Amino acid sequence: MNHPKSEELILGLTTAFIDQSNNSNLAYRPEFVYNDHKQGKKVLVSLEQELKRCDEFFISVAFITDSGFESLSMILKELEQKGVPGKILTTDYLTFSQPKALDRLAQLKNIELKMFRTNSEVGGFHTKGYIFREEELYQIIIGSSNMTSKAITENREWNTKIVSTEQGEVAQEILNEFKNLWMSPNSQYYEEFIEDYKEQYLQNQIIKKQQRQAAKEQIVDFESYKLKPNKMQLAFINNLMDMRSEGIEKALLLSSTGTGKTYASAFAVRELGYQKVLFLVHRNQIAEQALKSYQKVFGPSVKMGLVTGKSHDYGADFIFATVQTLSKKENLERFARDHFECCIYDEAHHTSADSYKKIMDYFTPQFTLGMTATPDKKDDHIEGRNIYEIFDHNIAYEIRLQKAMEEDLLCPFHYFGITDLEIIDDMIANDKKMTKEQKLENFRKLTSDDRVKYVMEQAEYYGYSGIRVKGLIFCSRIEEANELSKKFNEHGWRTLALSGADSEEVRRDAVERLVNDDINELDYILSVDIFSEGVDVPEINQVIMLRPTQSPIVFIQQLGRGLRKAEDKEYVVILDFIGNYKNNFMIPIALSGDRSYNKDNVRKYVVSGNSLIPGASTIHFDEISKERIFNAVDNLKSMKALIKESYTSLKNRLGRIPRLVDFYENEEIDPMIIIREYKTYHAMLKAMEKKQEIEELSDSETLILEYLSKTILSGVRPQELELLKMLLEHNEVSIEEFQEDVSEEFGYLLDMDAIQNTIRILQGHFHINSAEHQKYAQIDILKVNENKRIQRLNSFVRKLNESEFRKELNDIISFGLHRYKDKYNQNKNQGVPFVLYEQYSRRDVCFLMNCEKDLSSVMYGMKRIKDDVFIFVTYHKKQTKDISKKYVDGKPDYEDIFESNQIFSWDTQLGKGVNSSYSQNVITAPRKHLMIQKRDSQIKFYYLGQFDILEVKPAKKLNQ
């Protein structure tokens, strides 16, 4: 019991095995380790956390696969660079471990790799244990998870993590067992076993392939082999049939790339019984692929044909045509207007173009279906003619990337955000305003030998699934693609650059060379955007992005090129080379599917993406890439362009001018961002709808909306919103009625102080200075009359007769209450009005503590409010180890730090010693609250709950 961590370990054991309410340090607590992304839990995340902080590691697992290595490849590379040693022991048991994975592990200089050879004498080998040593402590994860992608991300797995000193009995037994297995004569080093094992593995794979082939040959006719719709396709078909029964004639299928839109349409056509079908595309290659898909669904029972530049099968029942060919007058007029019962428009975001409009205006089918993964692609919209409008705002089914991954419709991807060379930034990527000499210099940087070598090294380390690489590389411009292709070829890769100038035949030939293994093979095709959509190349197993992210939509389009499932393809690798780009913040937005543009959500996904992403996919950023994204988030100032994009998209989708609450309900941009930029939603509408008739509001009406948007819209508490809601319907309400309503709706009783504070706030008294006091003194909403009832003012009643003003008030109430119920209507922490780990501004703290006015301008590191004291901490700040220094970059140098997940060390302000009134305000407060923000650029603080003081002592810095 003399170990320095004994007490912490005992507390951890008590929490884990005796009383879960017992407080203990998470670092010393046993845990149940399992996979459930909805709970933010994955075995992979636990492994990465332990690998990141360990001094050495030992792993003994029965099975290691290539996908398992891929999931851990970035952290393993980092450990190699740090020189952290590791020993990994696997086995030939069941010949399951993949030689490719073992080869990749053996490349790492810090890892010793052995294989335990099984036989009838020693029996099987089925261990699954991960041992991590950090200084004198061991973190050990033992259970059911092998080092396979499924086991550490997706499968139902049960593992236990224990924490022990080296002297602990269980740790000793585990370490001894590992040592015995490692030193066993049956354990061979990589060089000793690999050739023999590869031969053994190959023979085993040949047998398995023969068994699969034999099983396939048992299928003798088309009916037996008939394709069946997946879960997404079934839901789409059911919705479509309901729509048709209601007489709906147009609809959209919005489905993420790779989820099977073409097959979905074929199944729907089969179910609805259409005999004459037009399938319209914008490229020959896509028409050919669509025809093949339909043939797999219908077999030989339907006559199908192409109408393209080279094919003219006008007599077919199902026609697959290119828009360029069919839009010609002489070709259209070959058909009666009602010839087709169903017209299907692939990549329907192009339907606003004149050529599509010509075809759509000509035909009068019973039903028109549009299909796209990118309905909001802004460059495809023409004023007054957007995709939603074209298809009458009917969405038959929508499935986004996250949902598609949950449903296992896509190939898992492993995304790696890798730091590009320091020289790669926005100046290089966007050189339109530069001189010829500057452009030439930028071109040299983008195509430098150093960059070529760096890209090749990363691509070869992170690898691909399958026998050989079949990759796409996206570049900023075609000149760059051509030069990079030339240099890659000089260094041994087989690549080809393609552009829009290349013919369909050249493109088709390039794709054939890329995917087929028995012709003049290509490793990579380089392009700018011709592969961003449409072309179906399921075999793609690596995508390299050598350009800045221009939008989440384009990012997902390019990522999506690798997401189609294919035989012998277990996963796709996405390598994103991240330069110093201002748009880097769009990367986590695209990956997460979170369109709120909430900065904290963006940061969270960069740090914790692996615990949140569905399925076996993984997300990794190296440390410099993380910082580049964080900097892009911090430097994101004006959001007006993003607001406009979100507004336009939502308006198009709804077919009307959206309300503020619509953004919230449709998961568009965070309405709080709109208010920060425009002060009121009405002001934003006026800015957006310059050609639309938005009713004017009086100055006093605008003032009320601005004040309410600033104070109560965020929904941190509901009573002001609820009282306002009551006063929209009733001329007056009693205090008892108001109390009862709040109690019934929100489950808590307002005391008289809270009621008085609510009334004062709605009277305009929550202000920060004399200027605001004078400004908001004009707020005329309510009064307390002689009967002690809360009554609307007559001037407010007159304002309510204005429909636009009433509409805006209803919107504030609706959104504010929605937000309260979703974020703040939880069990409050020990009777205080704060929710653990939610975010609050200094203004919110004043608001929730019933302050008579906004004190946020005088709330710095500490504020005492009656019996409560609040500590406000900025966690990431520049510091110096020089104890004689008081300031860093003009700011006080505080040493605020988490010593553990339970103990926080806080420095008072300079010159505020232990006996100062400042310090005594903290020490003597009955309730003490800790609020932390990560960076100065953030406005809000995370509420980390109440704390007790363990020790008060002079700080290292003078007078703290």
Cite the ranges covered by each PLM segment.
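Conserved interdomain linker/interface between the two RecA-like ATPase lobes of SF2 helicase motors
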Residues: 393-471
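Acidic, glycine-rich low-complexity segments with interspersed aromatic residues
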Residues: 690, 703-709, 719-726, 830-940
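PLD/PLD-like phosphodiesterase catalytic module centered on the HKD motif
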Residues: 1-230, 234
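Conserved segment of the helicase C-terminal RecA-like domain
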Residues: 552-557, 561-591
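Walker A/P-loop
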Residues: 245-269, 283
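Conserved helicase ATPase core of P-loop NTP-dependent helicases/translocases
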Residues: 288, 306, 311-312, 331, ...
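Long, largely alpha-helical accessory region at the distal end of helicase-like NTP-driven motors
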Residues: 203-229, 240, 441-442, 451-454, ...
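Post-DEXD/H (motif II) to motif III coupling segment of the RecA-like Helicase ATP-binding lobe
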Residues: 350-415
